[in-house]
Amino acid sequence: MCTRNKKDITTEYLNSKKIDRELKQESTTLQPLKLLLLGSGECGKSTIFKQIISFQDEATKKEYTPPSDYVIKNIFLNILTATSTFVRVAPSYNIEFSEEENQKIQSILNVFSDLENLDQTVFTSVSDNIKYLWNSKQIQSIYNNTNRIFQLNDSTEYLMSNIDRYSKPFKPTQNDFLRVRVKTTGIVEADFKIEAVPFKLVDVGGQKNQRRKWIHCFQDITCVLFVTSINDYDTLLEEDNSTSRFTDSLELFREMVNSNWFTKSPFVLFFNKIDLFKEKIKRIPVSQHLKDFNGNDHSYEETSQFIKNKFHTTIKNSNKIVYHHFTCALDSRAIEVVFNSIQHSLLMNVAEIL
């Protein structure tokens, strides 16, 4: 049996304290470890950004967490947007509404056309009408249709199921904060320290019209966190209904992972929204949209590995460091485990330099 004597333990402790002191001294001169979040629109990047911030100290969380009234207004906006989307696409599904339902719809659309004045009182005035429509057979048939011809926030069902709570003054929960959709435009940055080492986390808008701004963020990247929604194998881009989200994400990854900007930067590839993916493959065959898949359409293991391999085969440099994780960005514990692994590797590299 191998034992460690008191001298070994003391030496290890002193070495650890020495590294801590050196890190603290060097933190004033160290360049931040720059983490860049990349991915197509609505892949879950911003949710991962929110999660990473939530793992930091209280001061960092306070600085980068938006105020409650901002979150509340966007919850209302998400719900109104989903409702108006259902109404807009109803004719495409040969769905008609009664005169009473049309009156309820009109009251909602009146609010949607005057978002400047959207507040708790205004939302409450139409919340019963929204709830009525959401629970109607017409809207549910549109929502559950496997051939969707429209884009919808993944959190729609969650938000709609909480309308009663949102109909009176409330304090947003962490789950509300993670699920509310606010489209990222431009560049969002957060600075924080972990074990006295400075980090900079950068999130950029994923829509095609936002990508021209990305190049301003490409210098001195320590690690790229690339997020793809594994659930989007059957979905078209919101901004381009002729291109599938899967193809767009795959081509974007191919471009980024082989870019000269990131020759020395490791990649962490998040196959996100596995919770939705597991449910979707029960209803919508992967082979129906990814024609070269010839495995079991209902097997999570086979379908997820096939998609993972599609991404990995785009990597031209066999020495390129690319880690991958299958994730649900809403699962705080799982994302924390992944981020702890990332930060541990990066901090070890810093310690080796000192």
Curated annotation (Swiss-Prot):
Region (G4 motif): 268-275
Region (G2 motif): 176-184
Subunit organization: G proteins are composed of 3 units; alpha, beta and gamma. The alpha chain contains the guanine nucleotide binding site.
UniProt-listed InterPro entries: Gprotein_alpha_su (IPR001019), GproteinA_insert (IPR011025), P-loop_NTPase (IPR027417)
Gene3D superfamilies the UniProt entry points to: GI Alpha 1, domain 2-like, P-loop containing nucleotide triphosphate hydrolases
Any one GO MF annotation of this record: metal ion binding
Keyword set includes Metal-binding: yes
Positions with a binding annotation for GTP: 39-46, 178-184, 203-207, 272-275, 329
Function per UniProt: Guanine nucleotide-binding proteins (G proteins) are involved as modulators or transducers in various transmembrane signaling systems.
Cross-referenced SMART domains: G_alpha
Name of protein: Guanine nucleotide-binding protein alpha-12 subunit
SUPFAM superfamilies named among the record's database cross-references: P-loop containing nucleoside triphosphate hydrolases, Transducin (alpha subunit), insertion domain
Region described as G3 motif: spans on this chain: 199-208
Domain G-alpha: 31-354
Region (G1 motif) location: 34-47
Family per record: Belongs to the G-alpha family.
Region (G5 motif): 327-332
Gene Ontology biological process terms, A to Z: adenylate cyclase-modulating G protein-coupled receptor signaling pathway
Name of encoding gene: gpaL
Positions of disulphide bridges: none
UniProt keyword terms in alphabetical order: GTP-binding, Magnesium, Metal-binding, Nucleotide-binding, Transducer
GO CC entries: cytoplasm; heterotrimeric G-protein complex
Residues holding Mg(2+): 46, 184
